């Protein structure tokens, strides 16, 4: 009865898999309240005249008001859910549809939550409906829209920051790989230089040994030559002749002895 063809504007049975728990609860409560108001409207009167009066006078007006109330309230709830900073509402993602969202205890949103709770708890009392003025709803929506734009821009900046961070991470990986390759090249060059230095040290040590052996051999050779020269000069040494007895006797007195004997002695020399 409530869901007949005349209520084409009813969005019931909506897909709430991607909504936050808060929005899902709010919309469910809204559906129940709307059904209750329509039930009151569709109640049969005691007499035919009363039913006719209700049908022709009140019913169209009440249905229009319920329609307006339902659309405004639903739109406001969806917009408010988008503005909540800790909302996990994410369209097109089924993997995050069951994440927890924060309640209305944040200081920056407590006043708005309280206003919404008071507004959502409004109900029909003693057969009289409590309606929200359309101008009031429009004012609230106008206040919300700039915040929504700022929030959307913030989300765009956040996405840009995420993209930039991802790009920087990729560049960091590339640079790290380049540094690693350079370090490997340096280590290989150091290993090659170490091998070359070791070979030079060994060659230097071998050359030192050869030079030392050559010097020792040359010194030994020079020592042997000097000894041979000394041995070669020994046969040529002259014997000293003492002529003291021969000349002192004749020249000391300025007179020569017997000529014949003297000449014989000289001949002997």
From Swiss-Prot:
Q: Ranges for the NAB domain? A: 6-87
Q: Which residues form a coiled coil?
A: 155-214
Q: Mostly located where?
A: cytoplasm
One protein family per Pfam: KIP1
| GO CC annotation | cytoskeleton; nuclear membrane; vacuolar membrane
Which GO molecular function annotation, any one, does this entry have? actin binding
Q: Which UniProt keywords apply?
A: Coiled coil, Cytoplasm, Cytoskeleton, Membrane, Nucleus
Basic and acidic residues composition bias: residue spans: 91-103
Alphabetized InterPro entries for the sequence: NAB, NET_actin-binding_domain
**Where found?**
Cytoplasm, Cytoskeleton; Nucleus membrane
Renumbered residue ranges of the record's region Disordered: 87-113
User: Could you give the domain comment from the record?
Assistant: The NAB domain, also called NAB (NET actin-binding) domain, is sufficient for F-actin binding.
Q: What does this protein do?
A: Plant-specific actin binding protein. May be part of a membrane-cytoskeletal adapter complex.
State the similarity comment.
Answer: Belongs to the NET family.
From the Swiss-Prot or TrEMBL record, give the protein name. Answer: Protein NETWORKED 3A
Q: Which organism is it from?
A: Arabidopsis thaliana
